[in-house]
Amino acid sequence: MSKSADLFAKAQKIIPGGVNSPVRAFAGVGGSPLFIERADGAYIFDADGKAYIDYVGSWGPMILGHNHVAVRDAVIKAAQQGLSFGAPTEMEITMAELVSKLVPSMEQIRMVSSGTEATMSAIRLARGFTNRDKIIKFEGCYHGHADCLLVKAGSGALTLGQPNSPGVPADFAKHTLTCTYNDLETVREAFAAHPEQIACIIVEPVAGNMNCIPPVPGFLEGLRTICDDFGALLILDEVMTGFRVSEGGAQGYYNIKPDLTTLGKIIGGGMPVGAFGGRKDIMQYIAPTGPVYQAGTLSGNPVAMAAGHACLSVLTEEGNEKRLANTTKILANGFKSLADKYNIPLAINQVGGMFGFFFTEQKTVTSYADVTKCDIERFKRFFNLMLKSGVYLAPSAYEACFTSLAHGDKEIEATLNAAERAFATLAKEANA
């Protein structure tokens, strides 16, 4: 038995399911999850000392690569001054100014401690500002585990086949309207049925929790127009896409101006952090300047702020955005070429530093319905073949994968060599 398997057995005795977040349990791919001992650059190292080229990146935050010296040094320096004060610090201002500079729609910003907290708070603010109760989300999109958002959700909820969670009262769920991602007609129908009751639309501008689904042309623009027509707010959930799709997030990439934006992952450089922000008149509606209450003991944590500022400072150095996108494109195209070589039906989506692949006969994958038609068993087999070759992909067919600035030619070549062996095995098994 590997040390990871031994630790997993031990963990299940004291931690529900043996993990502190469901998708880590490998339920979507089988076997025991890797228990990680350390990480550096493009690599993670499991409890048995085996190295893996990592395309999970702590589910997105590690865009510079693991254990980057600038982030590590910033964390050490900040920690030496104290871990938490429960009072304002100058670094909170510095960090907020940097984020606002990169994402101009965020005229004012409130720091929180997680992406879930950011989306939950943004929705509360939207409801308070508009004096409306209902919200629109999209099937297969995941915005954290707040009660009102666990309705036809993606990510780990989708992996486990439980997109609607027990424990969410019907009275909460009834205010959440679910539409079809990349289908504006379903949104128009929702507003036609509830014209003055919908506070906001919340959407992942690139859906990363049902794998990787970019918006079709006109979709985000259509959402903006519909919100304007009906007096609702548009919230872009950029917890995953923020600074990964482009320096200005998906909203910069697609030239869409939301009313509110939520961030997480990358802005903490690996530390727990989230943020929400937007139009000043809306943000002024939150306490202490307005009536909508939101608070957090560790919000704006000085160590997390230092880590995030260091991460964004390096990330936005000239040439890094283009290099990350090019690396990801080369990798995605390589996967597709190899799949074609071995007659394995595969569709690939890629935007900036995120990508996803789908074992399907379909040429394009643009919706939750498309994703659910993919060959999950073939994905499981491919994942485990790649893992055996030292390549760690997202352990679920419903999760996006991520590259980092630490992924170079060596890592891409090794990954594609492993992929060729895996596709060859899949082809052989299909013809057996």
Swiss-Prot record:
Keyword Nuclease belongs to the record: no
Q: Where does this polypeptide localize?
A: Cytoplasm
This protein's pathway reads: Porphyrin-containing compound metabolism; protoporphyrin-IX biosynthesis; 5-aminolevulinate from L-glutamyl-tRNA(Glu): step 2/2
User: Could you provide one GO biological process annotation from this protein's UniProt record?
Assistant: protoporphyrinogen IX biosynthetic process
Q: Which reaction equations make up its catalytic activity?
A: (S)-4-amino-5-oxopentanoate = 5-aminolevulinate
InterPro entries for the chain: 4pyrrol_synth_GluAld_NH2Trfase (IPR004639), Aminotrans_3 (IPR005814), Aminotrans_3_PPA_site (IPR049704), PyrdxlP-dep_Trfase (IPR015424), PyrdxlP-dep_Trfase_major (IPR015421), PyrdxlP-dep_Trfase_small (IPR015422)
Q: Which CDD domains match?
A: OAT_like
* MF-aspect GO terms: glutamate-1-semialdehyde 2,1-aminomutase activity; pyridoxal phosphate binding; transaminase activity
Any idea of its EC number? 5.4.3.8
Assembly state and interactors?
Homodimer.
**Protein name from the UniProt record:** Glutamate-1-semialdehyde 2,1-aminomutase
Species, as recorded: Photobacterium profundum (strain SS9)
